[in-house]
Curated annotation (Swiss-Prot):
Region (Glutamate--cysteine ligase): 1-337
Protein name per Swiss-Prot or TrEMBL: Glutathione biosynthesis bifunctional protein GshAB
Keyword Nucleotide-binding carried by entry: yes
Originating species: Mannheimia succiniciproducens (strain KCTC 0769BP / MBEL55E)
Transmembrane segments: none
UniProt gene name: gshAB
Amino acid sequence: MNIQQIVKEKGLGLLFRQGTVGIEKESQRVHADGSIVTSEHPKAFGNRSYHPYIQTDFAESQLELITPPNKKIEDTLRWLSALHEVTLRTIDENEYIFPMSMPAGLPPEQEIRVAQLDNAADVAYREHLVASYGKAKQMVSGIHYNFQLDPKLVETLFNAQTDYKSAVDFQNNLYLKMAKNFLRYQWIPLYLLSATPTVEANYFKDGSPLKPNQYVRSLRSSKYGYVNAPDIIVSFDSIEKYVETLEHWVNSGRLIAEKEFYSNVRLRGAKKAREFLHTGIQYLEFRLFDLNPFEAYGINLKDAKFIHHFILLMIWLEETADQDAVELGRARLGEVAFEDPHSETAYRDEGEQIINQLIDMLKAIGAEQSAVEFAEEKLAQFANPGQTLCARLVDAIEQAGGYQQLGGEIAKRNKVQAFERFYALSAFDNMELSTQALMFDAIQKGLNMEILDENDQFLRLQFGDHFEYVKNGNMTSHDSYISPLIMENKVVTKKVLAKAGFNVPQSLEFTSVEQAVASYPLFEGKAVVIKPKSTNFGLGISIFQQGVHDKADFAKAVEIAFREDKEVMVEDYLVGTEYRFFVLGNETLAVLLRVPANVMGDGVHTVAELVAAKNDHPLRGDGSRTPLKKIALGEIEQLQLKEQGLTVDSVPAKDQLVQLRANSNISTGGDSIDMTDEMHPSYKDLAVGITKAMGAAVCGVDLIIPDLKKPAEPNLSSWGVIEANFNPMMMMHIFPYSGKSRRLTLNVLGMLFPELV
């Protein structure tokens, strides 16, 4: 069967280059100096018996981060980024993730703790590995690259050939060709991507085989790495021989289980190899790859795509390696692994020949030009070995003064980077912050998570057989359909709350600008709020705390409100302080004082300059990707300045508070101050009652309260309801400008999955 010919004749280039990729990355938790920790796996990650993303490999210190499979390599690496950020922000503040594959600072063997798992068989398996290989070899880490061809491609290729009658037989032989050819040419990606040139002497039982100042390309892939005894050979000639020889080694006791066979390619998709005979190989796991210490997550997008294309080349090639060729590949791997990283490889001609075939394949299947160019960069590294990853790593080790020193320095930099935007998941930065926070907590606690629609903030979460849908961080099936519709309409909200006996301010509604402006005499001199009938996040709201005295200002506020809706309300302004109550179920979980957008004068700078300086705060940004919003100087802000006799060019006196907004929404530049513990419980109970009247499970209730310490009384002079909000913002509670953080996303997960708590 000539796959090249079929792909070309049937125009299958796009389908051919597609596939599904998942990555497993092992790493050691270390101290700041790069030495391995002896602490337990953090309990904050939940139970390893079910965690889909954050596991331990051999030891308690050895993290294993597992991405879900994705059709886009970019998405797989985004997940890997998110898993690293969750992990680095969760482990002890004095712990780091070591960026290299070979361990450094190994503690005495008796202090290396085998992973403490619930399943006794899993622990027993690890104890067997200790007896067979010692603990040091088990501490080696790397990247496992899981790859599946597009099932439609496999089906199309099967239908286009005549050699195989059974689809299962065809699929097995297709994946076996991929596996055998990879094992034949595995030395090539090792030459280009290896990064384990050295290790400390205590890694070896009988002394280091390395001479002083000697570096090699890959200790991990050499006979000193994570490998079986040299006489354990499993045949890849056919799926039947593979099953037969693998079962032989297990039955003879040389391997305790099939998974102890440490081939650089592992057949995947069944619990036992014999099942492949009937169900077929589903995907392959490529276990060759060292961690790239120069990348925060151990691998970069270019290399991940290169690996993808190299794997595809293995079935594109006309040849199919037999077992002798597989063994030749294993021998060459051992030779190249022990070459000097700065030296030209003994097999340069073969390497250049294969990469040239890769370039031809990329052009034939219509790959991106960038993929061709990157393959050409790899080709050039055969003539310039100093450009390879391992050679560059050796240079960096020499410059840093040692392997462990370099690893510790990089580990510390990576952790600092993970905290630069500690409130976000940088790979999913286009999603709203509340959703990112929920995703962070879901990953940390071990919920399966699927992003159904990234732009619409739609997630599917699952624990066991129980699944829930979440939109925008806290919109769930626990809310009734009607509740957000009630809260969106401020007129309906007021009527529902009034009927339920809650204090609401009086108001009039208008359907045209002319009608509203004509009513100015009714409100002249009165303190009023002008706002759209249907609004959220403070859009279109103007507040005249000192009374409205200028018809032009009144008209401008009306015009601003009508930009947001076709109906507008003018309501009495309630005297007091506005607080936001976050209610979930039967409990008020957080209370926030939102201080309207403001600046403090210094007697030197203009209002515009003071605003610019305050906007430089690292938590301020667009308000959707940052916890705080930058303060604007638009029409509403300039109206507010005019009320105070100021303009943007005014220079306020020292310590003069300048209000830029009357409404206190964080989404319009306000400051957030946690007041949960200071608020009298009677108001918290009122907020719960208001939420129930709305028919909501999650609600943001805005109350005006003159004195938060006095118990609530049944009149407007004691308290009043301004708004009830669906999908209330959570980030201002999680990351307040001042006060205690309230991690509300954990409460949302607790509501959805009480069995997880």
